[in-house]
């Protein structure tokens, strides 16, 4: 606790027995990732983890399709990862196991629940920032 003495102009600090937690601020650059996960072909994911927060930047090249490029690594019939993020360039179509399709493009914020396939549309790479990358494109078992 601090008190100000207006007569002397001094601040008196009294140490308390209470515990205080200092706020922590940490910054990392995605261009120096902790890990780069290469897909079977057609791209990769750069992954940075700070504490319990993980962010990935997925670069999906033309011709990329989850069922061709990640399924062999994941070992599941469809992607079982929940993705939340934003598309910054390119276009990707996502098809849920129930047949629902949604396309995302630059500026689109998305939530993709587990149980989907996806592919790049067009001849431009699709770049996504995704908070669901901690388990993505990692071998199961």
Q: Predicted segment positions?
A:
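Short, conserved beta-strand element in jelly-roll/cupin
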Residues: 76-94
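Glyoxalase I/VOC metalloenzyme domain signal
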Residues: 31, 62-64, 133-141
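Short acidic-glycine-tyrosine-enriched beta hairpin
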Residues: 97-115
């Amino acid at each position: 606790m601090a008190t100000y003495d207006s007569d002397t102009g001094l601040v008196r600090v009294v140490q308390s027995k209470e515990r205080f937690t200092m706020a922590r601020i940490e910054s990392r650059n995605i261009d120096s990732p902790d890990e780069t996960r290469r897909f079977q072909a057609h791209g990769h994911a750069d992954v940075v983890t700070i504490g319990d927060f993980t962010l990935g930047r997925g670069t999906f090249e033309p011709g990329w399709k989850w069922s061709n490029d990640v399924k062999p690594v994941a070992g599941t019939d469809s992607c079982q990862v929940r993705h939340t993020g934003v598309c910054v360039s390119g276009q990707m179509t996502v098809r849920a196991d129930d047949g629902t399709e949604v396309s995302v493009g630059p500026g689109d914020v998305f939530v993709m629940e587990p149980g989907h396939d996806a592919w790049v549309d067009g001849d431009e790479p699709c770049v996504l920032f995704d908070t669901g990358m901690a388990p993505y494109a990692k071998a199961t078992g």
